Amino acid sequence: MRSDAIKKGHLKAPNRSLLRACGLKDEDFDKPFIGVANSYIDIIPGHYFLNNYAKIIKDEICKNGCVPFEFNTIGVDDGIAMGHEGMLYSLPSREIIANSIETVMNAHQLDALICIPNCDKITPGMLMGALRVNVPTIFVSGGPMASGVTKKGEKISLSSVFEAVGAYEAKKISEEEFKDIECSACPSGGSCSGMFTANSMNTLCEAMGIALEGNGTILALSKEREELLRKAARRICEIALDERFKIRNIITQKAVRNAMVVDMAMGGSSNTVLHMLAISREAGVALDIKDLNFISSKVAHIAKIAPSLNSVYMDDIHKAGGVSAVMAEISSRQGHILELDALTITGESLKERLKNAKIKDENIIRKVDNAYSKVGGLAILFGNLAEQGCVIKTAGIIGERKFKGKAVCFNSQDEAIKGIIKGKVQKGNVCVIRYEGPKGGPGMQEMLSPTSLLMGMGLGADVALITDGRFSGATRGLSVGHISPEAAEGGLIGLLKDGDEIEIDVDAYTIHANVSEEEIAKRKKEFALPQKEVSSRWLRMYQKLVSNASKGAVLDME
């Protein structure tokens, strides 16, 4: 056993003495030691109950002949961190989470790992850390919350509240309606109820085979979710010493491809691109941002979920057959785009896992021949504005897929929010928000507040927004993010001026500023990078080491 390094032989008597102080007995030193990586924190609605979930898992591990050791990671709630300096810390928290998993697991030489993530950066951070450790691993998330319901009977989610801010600013809803939306949107614990970043990543864990069926869709705080926890705990005990189930044997090239196929079919958050690039790097798997358009071109978009379709939420997907039904439909209709021989954590191939899966409600999960789109719900655009690529969630577009407009430039998200409220962005404009990339922020803030303001003010179908920052999974509209190279590293987005004409053609995968080469060269000579004081030592370190978004915004030591 890997854990023999801390428990076997007379030289390890001091180690055992410390473990005895934690309650271990003689017989425990012959059992596998299993790390239970929790992410319990009171301030995140998807995490405040995870202390109880960890207890369920630990009790089951003990019943099945292993010894659990719980430890915790930090967590940041992107919704609560939104709209102030706290958002600078969201993406960097992914690296801290990855480092903490690696540190605890390797410092104590634990044999296997079960991770309990749920929201935002916690799932990808745990995946990255687990891949570094490379022991048998299972992920079991806390689960999505139920959708909210207003007094009028309308189903809503957190994204509805962000958009209500814009509607209230524009005097389109009353104060009473505004309050009702605020108080109704998040009715329970769990990750926010739509296909936002948290649910996207928990769904992709299922697609990659590192989680059991239902991981992405079974509601939080339900009896069914508790049973999933117990199943995961029993399974980690069964495989704790089986090298076939080391996480790098599960998250392979095939698994990463399967994740991106499901991402396209379900219209996942644009953040998944950033995270899957980082995860594939830790797995030693090749994933180039340029490959994603090929996958998208081969995968129909068959499940549309809030915020793209505000009548459908994760619990609806679960009732309609879940992620397995989506994968089964894609595999039966779209050739060999899914790698069906990929190994899952149950020991089954993906093909075996899907053999009984079927769509139970074609109004929720469509057949391929009735898809929302013949291509996937994400696209990568290239052009002089994004030579290394940028990302758009095509599933969230509510207007035209081709757009031409005049730039209105802002050098920060805060500046953009003020400008939008003051009416500086009008129909037909392209709202440009720059110096918000991984280095420029630093931290690559999400632009949910500006996109939601535009949507709530009735401009969502008539304005494009481009940024070197990123978006919440709750964003919709013609919103292009992750522009690389970013402004802080000399990207063309930093040279744009108000009135420059910008063309976006989603179906041609292009984004272009209609500025002559001579004018660009002139602006480069005159350009001076705006100086931004960064008082945080951690953020200065992050700024110095982080790559741009086209590489996953990872800390690059090379």
Swiss-Prot record:
UniProt: Mg(2+) binding residues: D78, D120, K121, E446
PROSITE patterns recorded: ILVD_EDD_1, ILVD_EDD_2
Residues with the N6-carboxylysine modification: K121
Pathway: Amino-acid biosynthesis; L-isoleucine biosynthesis; L-isoleucine from 2-oxobutanoate: step 3/4; Amino-acid biosynthesis; L-valine biosynthesis; L-valine from pyruvate: step 3/4
Recorded GO CC terms: cytosol
Reaction equation(s) it catalyzes: (2R)-2,3-dihydroxy-3-methylbutanoate = 3-methyl-2-oxobutanoate + H2O; (2R,3R)-2,3-dihydroxy-3-methylpentanoate = (S)-3-methyl-2-oxopentanoate + H2O
Cofactor-binding details, from the entry: Binds 1 [2Fe-2S] cluster per subunit. This cluster acts as a Lewis acid cofactor.
BP GO annotations: isoleucine biosynthetic process; L-valine biosynthetic process
Domain of life: Bacteria
Single GO MF descriptor: dihydroxy-acid dehydratase activity
Names of the cofactor(s): [2Fe-2S] cluster; Mg(2+)
Active-site feature positions: S472 (proton acceptor)
Binding site for [2Fe-2S] cluster: C119, C192
EC number(s) per entry: 4.2.1.9
The protein's role, per its UniProt record: Functions in the biosynthesis of branched-chain amino acids. Catalyzes the dehydration of (2R,3R)-2,3-dihydroxy-3-methylpentanoate (2,3-dihydroxy-3-methylvalerate) into 2-oxo-3-methylpentanoate (2-oxo-3-methylvalerate) and of (2R)-2,3-dihydroxy-3-methylbutanoate (2,3-dihydroxyisovalerate) into 2-oxo-3-methylbutanoate (2-oxoisovalerate), the penultimate precursor to L-isoleucine and L-valine, respectively.
Family membership: Belongs to the IlvD/Edd family.
Quaternary organization: Homodimer.
Name of the protein described by the UniProt record: Dihydroxy-acid dehydratase
